[in-house]
Regions:
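Metal-cofactor-dependent catalytic cores
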Residues: 2-260
Length: 260
């Protein structure tokens, strides 16, 4: 486990309240592929150890965002990265299982060819030491928000649609409570000892939430429900200001800060 380190937040705390506990922790070794649900994980400056450290680069892309995501190839969500046998948590995956059950080396030509066949354009697996993230290195959502979206959309409230790093179960159930966390700090575990995340922005959603993680089929009602209910936001993004160990069951506290 890495030593706990801090980055100071340059404003004073005005209140601290216990809001819930960690219900689940996820990491996604390959961007847009299936994730791992883990019991515990080290949280470093660039997010959860092993999270989104690999991504498929579109080799013909010369401008903009070069990496292939499920927004362009929904089938990616059904590819499952497999860790090395006997490997440590956070190790890069050694193989990937396709939706049809075939296992291929993660950096091998066979996997690249399989993705190319589906995407109809060449790709290359890349290792990015600090990870590749859309907005920030940590995302958090609550069980209440997911359940409310499922109710409004008439679909199973599957957390995997939302691809969070941390799923929180609140002490006082309330959907979309995450919106009020922006500008504050979340801490995890024992007071003064566990990791901390500065909540920087609401998580604006895209078509990826519509895709069923098992079948890949689209349910547009999911995104429509988020748009109608909460201006297309569900969950939050944050940056790490104190590293440490995350574990299921840890207490989650919200530190509200005075305005700078």
């Amino acid at each position: 486990m890495p030593a706990v380190r801090d980055q100071a937040v340059p404003v004073a705390e005005i209140s601290v309240s216990e809001i819930g506990h960690i219900e689940a922790i996820f990491r996604y070794p390959v961007k847009s592929m299936a994730g791992d649900r883990v019991e515990a994980a080290d949280l470093g400056w660039h997010g959860i150890d092993g999270d989104r450290r690999l991504a498929l680069r579109r080799t013909r892309e010369r401008g903009g965002f070069p990496f292939l995501t499920a927004g362009k190839l929904p089938d990616l969500l059904r590819f499952v990265p497999l860790g090395p046998e006997g490997g440590a948590p956070g190790d890069l995956p050694a193989r990937v299982r396709t939706p049809e059950g075939h296992e291929m080396e993660v950096f091998g030509e066979e996997l690249a060819a399989e993705i190319e066949r589906r995407h109809r354009a060449p790709v290359q697996m890349m290792h990015l030491r600090d990870g590749i993230f859309d907005q920030a290195s940590i995302s958090v959502i609550t069980t209440d928000t997911i359940e409310e979206i499922g109710r409004l959309a008439g679909v199973d409230p599957d957390v995997r649609r939302f691809r969070p790093n941390i799923l929180v179960r609140l002490l006082r159930p309330e959907s979309f409570q995450e919106d009020r966390w922006v500008g504050g700090v979340l801490s995890f575990g024992e007071p003064g000892e566990g990791p901390r995340v500065n909540v920087t922005m609401r998580d604006e959603r895209c078509a990826m939430v519509t895709f069923d993680p098992e079948s890949g089929r689209s349910a547009p009602a999911v995104l429509k429900a988020i748009v109608r209910r909460n201006q297309n936001h569900a969950g939050i993004y944050g940056t790490v200001i104190r590293t440490g160990r995350l574990a299921i069951g840890q207490t989650v506290r919200l530190h509200e800060l005075a305005e700078a």
